[in-house]
């Protein structure tokens, strides 16, 4: 779900939005990896 949103979000022409979104996407990927790895129990 998130993986489908990230490329669209980060393709925005506004540099600030793209940068902020790329940082957010990295956080989301780290969180999803932690959840899959059992590090975080949601």
Curated annotation (Swiss-Prot):
Name under which the protein is recorded? Uncharacterized protein TP_0281
- Lineage, broadest ranks: Bacteria, Pseudomonadati, Spirochaetota, Spirochaetia, Spirochaetales
């Amino acid at each position: 779900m998130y993986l489908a949103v990230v490329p669209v979000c980060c393709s925005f022409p506004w540099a600030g939005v793209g940068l902020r979104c790329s940082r957010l996407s990295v956080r989301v990927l780290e969180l999803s990896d932690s959840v899959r790895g059992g590090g975080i129990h949601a």
